[in-house]
């Protein structure tokens, strides 16, 4: 059972999930932000993958993504920063990002890197459920990646 299922099946009354955009406030601080959030009682962390056209996000996340990209954050760098995170971080980690940068990275390569870094789940808000079922499900399942869906993507 992965850490997300363990968390939601636990008897924990209050679950606090926090989102932040990788590469903010500084390029090299992503792992430190995760460690600090866990230390202060966060139950699960959603790490945003910055993208130049975050159409489903509000202005705050759009600005964070812009700053992260200006700082030099990329998916490749994010995986490098998360490579050793599981040595000391025990809470569930979820990557949240748009399909375009994931496809540029290569969907199977993305799944492989998620496993190598101990990522528990992935949210891709612009991936329609039907496309997932037809093209990506078999790859995600091969790597035991838990894809979490937004209602809009699931309804398309």
Mark where each language-model region is.
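Short, well-ordered coil/turn segments that N-cap beta-strands
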Residues: 12-16, 41-43, 89-92, 119-120, ...
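N-terminal amphipathic alpha-helix/helix-capping segment at the start of soluble metabolic enzymes
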Residues: 1-17
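Glycine-rich, proline-tolerant flexible connector loops at the mouths of alpha/beta enzymes
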Residues: 46-73, 129
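Conserved small/polar residues in nucleotide/adenosyl-binding loops
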Residues: 149-156
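Active-site beta->alpha loop and helix N-cap motifs at the rims of alpha/beta catalytic domains
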Residues: 65-123
């Amino acid at each position: 059972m992965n850490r997300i299922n363990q968390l939601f099946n636990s008897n924990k009354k209050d679950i606090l999930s926090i989102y932040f955009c990788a590469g903010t406030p500084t390029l090299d601080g992503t792992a430190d932000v995760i460690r600090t959030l866990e230390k202060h009682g966060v139950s699960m962390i959603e790490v945003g993958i910055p993208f130049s056209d975050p159409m489903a996000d509000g202005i705050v996340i759009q600005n964070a993504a812009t700053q992260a990209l200006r700082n030099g954050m990329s998916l490749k760098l994010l995986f490098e920063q998360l490579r050793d995170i599981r040595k000391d971080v025990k809470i569930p980690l979820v990557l949240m990002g748009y399909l375009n940068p994931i496809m540029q990275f290569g969907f199977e390569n993305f799944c492989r890197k998620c496993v190598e870094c101990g990522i528990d789940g992935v949210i891709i808000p612009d991936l329609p459920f039907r496309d997932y079922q037809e093209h990506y499900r078999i790859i995600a399942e091969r790597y035991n990646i838990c894809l979490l869906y937004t209602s809009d993507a699931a309804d398309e």
